[in-house]
């Protein structure tokens, strides 16, 4: 089966959903021919993955995932693809903590760093939060504190099968955009940052029709966040429609150089996050309130981004966000 599909893809033929899904199901149930599957991934990348092909990857790995039974009308994730190569501070993780101060349930899906200094798992671990909490703890945390971290390797054991191959290939493949599409919690809302405009288009096409409201973002200066330096392209998804527009930070009185929000070690990033939640008005602060403000708009807490920024700022300035972090550290103690 794999050789037949490989022949089609190397000739730049698009595949049907069932062709890819059946292939992946067989691979995940049986033996993996790394050479042929690696060639398939590389050929698929060269051809350009279609919505049907990506959806088949998502469904095949989601079928094998450990899922969490948590149904709520306002579940949201702010997990990005990572891999933008900019080495910025953990903006979406900090924004997720502020977001949990509101009446939404933040299911933060993430992993350790692969390309940056500090992934979401790394910084949360340094904050003393157990990134491998048991399921009952996760569900209780979502219910009581509006926040849980879902450490991707715990929920996607099937990914281990392709881990060595991905490392050996050393190039971006369809797997680099799957993470945000595989949250173990059923999401109503989502903000996904991507590493390129091409990835942005692909993720948006797959999300369409699968969330109540979502947005996929990539900035002109290459960030997988809403930028505080340049305009950010937004693909907003609602009712199966995709609307494109740009967010300019200057419209909200925010303008800083991208280098002003660079990230460091997990320890240093944890210190920066605490300083943000304590209300220190640094570029990091404005990056967090801008991104949280946008998320509040997407999950329909704020009527627009401007109101979202005001709400985010108030949550920090009132110490509500800092107290939330203290609650999370106490609840998800890791002993670090």
From Swiss-Prot:
Binding locations of anthranilate 1: 80, 111
Annotated cofactor note: Binds 2 magnesium ions per monomer.
Keyword set, alphabetical order: Amino-acid biosynthesis, Aromatic amino acid biosynthesis, Glycosyltransferase, Magnesium, Metal-binding, Transferase, Tryptophan biosynthesis
Pfam family, one: Glycos_trans_3N
Pathway: Amino-acid biosynthesis; L-tryptophan biosynthesis; L-tryptophan from chorismate: step 2/5
Catalysed reactions, as listed in the record: N-(5-phospho-beta-D-ribosyl)anthranilate + diphosphate = 5-phospho-alpha-D-ribose 1-diphosphate + anthranilate
Molecular function in Gene Ontology: anthranilate phosphoribosyltransferase activity; magnesium ion binding
Positions of Mg(2+) 1 binding: 92, 225
Binding site for 5-phospho-alpha-D-ribose 1-diphosphate: 80, 83-84, 88, 90-93, 108-116, 120
The protein's name: Anthranilate phosphoribosyltransferase
């Amino acid at each position: 089966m794999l050789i037949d599909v490989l022949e089609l893809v190397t000739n730049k033929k698009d595949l049907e959903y069932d062709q890819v899904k059946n292939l992946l199901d067989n691979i995940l149930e049986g033996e993996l021919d790394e050479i042929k599957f690696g060639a398939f991934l590389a050929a698929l990348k060269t051809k350009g993955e279609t919505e049907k092909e990506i959806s088949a990857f998502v469904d095949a790995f989601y079928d094998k995932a450990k899922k969490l039974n948590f149904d709520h009308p306002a579940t949201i994730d702010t997990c990005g693809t990572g891999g933008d190569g900019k080495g910025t501070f953990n903006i979406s993780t900090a924004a997720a903590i502020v977001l949990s101060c509101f009446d939404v349930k933040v299911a933060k899906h993430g992993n350790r760093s692969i390309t940056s200094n500090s992934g979401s798992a790394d910084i949360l671990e340094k904050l003393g939060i157990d990134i491998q909490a048991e399921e009952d703890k996760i569900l209780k945390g979502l219910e009581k504190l509006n926040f849980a971290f879902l450490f991707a390797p715990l929920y996607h054991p099937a990914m281990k099968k392709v881990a060595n191959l991905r490392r050996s290939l050393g190039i971006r493949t369809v797997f680099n955009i799957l993470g945000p599409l595989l949250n173990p919690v059923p999401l109503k809302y989502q903000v996904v940052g991507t590493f390129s405009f091409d990835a942005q288009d692909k993720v948006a096409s797959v999300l369409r029709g699968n969330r109540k409201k979502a947005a996929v973002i990539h900035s002109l200066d290459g960030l997988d966040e809403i930028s505080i330096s340049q305009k950010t392209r937004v693909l907003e998804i609602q009712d199966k429609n995709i609307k494109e527009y740009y967010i300019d930070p200057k419209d909200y009185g925010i303008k800083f150089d991208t280098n002003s929000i660079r990230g460091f070690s997990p320890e240093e990033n944890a210190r920066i996050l605490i300083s943000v939640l304590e209300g220190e008005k640094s570029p990091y602060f404005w990056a967090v309130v801008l991104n949280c403000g946008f998320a509040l708009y997407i999950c329909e807490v704020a009527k627009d981004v401007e109101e979202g920024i005001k709400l985010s700022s108030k949550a920090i300035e009132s110490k509500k966000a800092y107290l939330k972090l203290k609650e999370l550290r106490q609840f998800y103690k890791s002993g670090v």
